[in-house]
Structures are given as C-alpha cells and as structure tokens.
C-alpha cells in the first residue's frame, strides 16, 4: 500500500530532541517500510502545499496527524477521491471539556464529534470513550494506541542504574513530574517548560537529551517511564 502520513509541520521529522508526535510519525513510516508498504511523510504547515503534494501521488490511505488540519479534510478527499482518510488528535486533554475553549480546541472537538465521513484513529481508549460518550459515529472510531519503536533502543540485561527510575517526558503540569521530584532514585529528562513548579536546578533533572542519545541511554535504568 501507498500511505501518506501528514505531520504538523512545526518541527522536522525525525526530531533531534523533544517531539513526541514527530517521533511517532517517523516510527510509523519506518515500520510501514519494513512491512513492505510505502510510507511517505508530508510535513508542512502550509495547507495548500499539503493538498498539492497529496494530489501528486496516488495514495491508498492518508493519515492526518494534526487535528488543526480538520478544516482541509474535505479538500484532501476532493484531491484524492480514491484514498481512505483518517485523522488523529494528539491533544492531551480530550477528556477535559472545560479546557477546550482555553486551548482553542472546542471547534476542533465539535468537528471530530460530528464527523461521519473519515476515520478517527484514537490514540488511547480514554479518547475513544470520550468521543463515544459525546455521540461520535462509532463506526468511524478506531483505537490505535501510541507505541515506541523498540528495535531502535539499546538493550541490556544489566542496566547501569538498576535501582533507579528514569521519567522521560516534556516537563509540564499535565505530566506532574513535580509530584515525584522528592522521591530518591528518580531522575528526569525532558524539555523544560516554565509552566510548572518542577525545579530544574536540582541534580535529579538531567535536561533534554538528543534523540540518538535517548535511544542509547534510556535503558541504563532499572525502570524507564516514557510519558508522551
């Protein structure tokens, strides 16, 4: 199959550091290739360019990984009438409707609920149940949980820090790293955002790792928690 994966166009794919969605899209394309399919990444914020690039090839399936592009789904369908279309929302607060207006997500969510043309690949069962609760068309809802490309990670049976835990993820209120910072034996890695009481000056915060370094060293620990 010939499959197009549409990214946000905010940062490069694959990312050099933090970029959970971008890493996921890269892993999808890599895995599709290993399975004998052709996974093409289109990664630009320019809606016109997205439609143009999609129309230049004959795709069997198009998966849009940025919910902000909901407003061009009909245009994509018109440009690629033979392709199956799906969209995924990676918004972390789908199940918290009180947050939607503050993040500009209310219009996007309304469209996702009312959509009955294109598949909605939910990245978690939590999101699936939220859509279902709000009367989305269940025939268009499919659960496709996020995962990690395990083959890229260095594996060892004897980690360097067997009694230590690594918490890997962007430092932000949603992930609540600040609650665990006083626990001995836990180290934190991730892009710091100045929106949380997490203290980045403490020794347990190791900063942000480059992607390749992360692949080599995330298994240095007895337990690694990757929070995307």
Question: Can you annotate each of these PLM segments?
Answer:
Residues 101-120:
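Membrane-proximal helix-turn-helix segments that form the acceptor-binding/catalytic region
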Residues 116-132, 136-154:
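Donor nucleotide-sugar binding/catalytic pocket of nucleotide-sugar-dependent glycosyltransferases
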Residues 3-4, 61-63, 76-96, 121:
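Active-site proximal beta-strand in glycosyltransferases
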Residues 97-100, 143-163, 198:
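Acidic anion/phosphate-binding donor-loop and adjacent secondary structure
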Residues 171, 192, 199-222:
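Conserved active-site histidine-acidic residue motif and adjacent donor-binding/catalytic loop
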Residues 53-70, 84-86:
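Short N-terminal targeting/anchoring amphipathic segment
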Residues 226-228:
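Conserved small/polar residues in nucleotide/adenosyl-binding loops
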Residues 121, 157-187:
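Conserved donor-binding/catalytic core segment of Leloir-type glycosyltransferases
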């Amino acid at each position: 199959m010939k499959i197009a994966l549409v990214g946000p166009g905010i940062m490069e794919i694959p990312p050099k550091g933090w970029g959970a969605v971008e890493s996921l899209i890269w892993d999808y394309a890599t895995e599709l290739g290993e399975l004998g399919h052709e996974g093409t990444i289109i990664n630009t914020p320019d809606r016109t360019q997205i439609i143009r690039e999609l129309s230049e090839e004959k795709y069997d399936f198009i998966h849009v990984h940025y919910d902000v592009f909901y407003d061009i789904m009909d245009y994509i369908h018109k440009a690629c009438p033979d392709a199956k279309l799906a969209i995924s929302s990676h918004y972390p607060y789908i199940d918290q409707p009180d947050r939607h207006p503050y993040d500009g997500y209310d219009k996007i969510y309304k469209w996702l609920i009312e959509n009955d043309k294109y598949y909605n690949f939910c990245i978690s069962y939590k999101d699936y149940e939220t859509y279902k609760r709000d009367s989305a068309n269940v025939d268009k809802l499919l659960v496709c949980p996020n995962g990690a490309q395990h083959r890229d990670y260095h594996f060892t049976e004897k980690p360097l820090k067997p009694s230590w835990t690594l918490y890997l993820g962007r430092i932000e209120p949603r992930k609540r790293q600040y609650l665990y910072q006083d626990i001995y034996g836990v180290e934190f890695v991730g892009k710091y955002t100045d929106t949380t009481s997490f203290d980045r000056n403490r020794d347990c915060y190791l900063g942000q790792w480059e992607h390749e370094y992360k692949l080599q060293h995330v298994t240095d620990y007895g337990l690694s928690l990757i929070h995307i």
